[in-house]
């Protein structure tokens, strides 16, 4: 099935506290001479109609990347759903006419070059309201497509229902799960630990650098 890809705003989620690396910003770690964040931006820029960064704290630390930084608008670091909500709110205000937001973890350096196209294709084929990425048998709910029209429902889920896990919220909707192969590498590998950074250096060669 071939569809026309609608305008899609990208958001890179970097709001986590990076406890497994002793604090700090995981996307600022370097792989093969480039930061992880540079790699993610380069991979998604051709696929999205603009990219913003969801991060908390001083936005100036990301100034070199030239992205608009949007903080959570729900307090106490409630997780990636808060970053997705912030992106939906920002898109509704600043990108009238754009109905879809792609979210991706800012510490996934090998994202697929067909991510946006295949997620849209999957949700269109299944007439779904949302779409998430899968590799092997592992779901990656942080990496998905979200309709701007669901933002008030998401806000209620976060603020009134205290829902924190993406899977718990998406269970309320028709969801398309779109799968990618894990060979020669898992495109949704993310750098959570110092050991993961070393593994990412090896995988970068398989990904073309």
UniProtKB/Swiss-Prot annotation:
It is found in: Cytoplasm. CDD domains: MobA. Keywords: Cytoplasm, GTP-binding, Magnesium, Metal-binding, Molybdenum cofactor biosynthesis, Nucleotide-binding, Transferase. Its EC number is 2.7.7.77. Its main location: cytoplasm. Mg(2+) binds at residue 107. GTP binds at residues 13-15, 26, 54, 72, 107. It comes from the Bacteria. Coiled coil: none annotated. Its cofactor is Mg(2+). The keyword 4Fe-4S does not apply. The keyword Glycoprotein does not apply. GO terms for molecular function: GTP binding; metal ion binding; molybdenum cofactor guanylyltransferase activity. One of its GO terms (cellular component) is cytoplasm. Monomer. This is Molybdenum cofactor guanylyltransferase. The lineage of its organism: Bacteria, Pseudomonadati, Pseudomonadota, Alphaproteobacteria, Hyphomicrobiales.
């Amino acid at each position: 099935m071939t569809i026309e890809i609608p305008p899609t705003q990208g958001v890179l989620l970097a709001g986590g506290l990076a406890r497994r690396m002793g604090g700090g910003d995981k996307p600022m770690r370097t792989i093969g001479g480039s930061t992880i964040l540079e790699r993610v931006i380069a991979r998604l820029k051709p696929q999205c109609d603009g990219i913003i960064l969801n991060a908390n704290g001083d936005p100036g630390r990301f100034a070199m990347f030239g992205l608009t930084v949007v903080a959570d608008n729900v307090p106490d670091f409630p997780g990636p759903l808060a970053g997705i909500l912030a992106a939906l709110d920002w898109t509704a205000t600043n990108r009238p006419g754009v109905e879809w937001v792609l979210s991706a973890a800012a510490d996934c350096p090998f994202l697929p070059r067909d991510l946006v196209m295949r997620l849209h294709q999957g949700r269109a084929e299944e007439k779904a309201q949302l779409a998430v990425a899968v590799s092997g048998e592992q779901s990656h709910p942080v990496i998905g497509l979200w309709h701007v029209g669901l933002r008030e429902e998401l806000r209620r889920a976060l603020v009134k229902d205290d829902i924190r896990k993406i899977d718990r919220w998406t269970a309320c909707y028709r969801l398309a799960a779109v799968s990618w192969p894990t060979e020669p590498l898992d495109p949704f590998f993310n750098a959570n630990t110092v050991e993961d950074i070393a593994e990412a250096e090896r995988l970068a060669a398989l990904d073309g650098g």
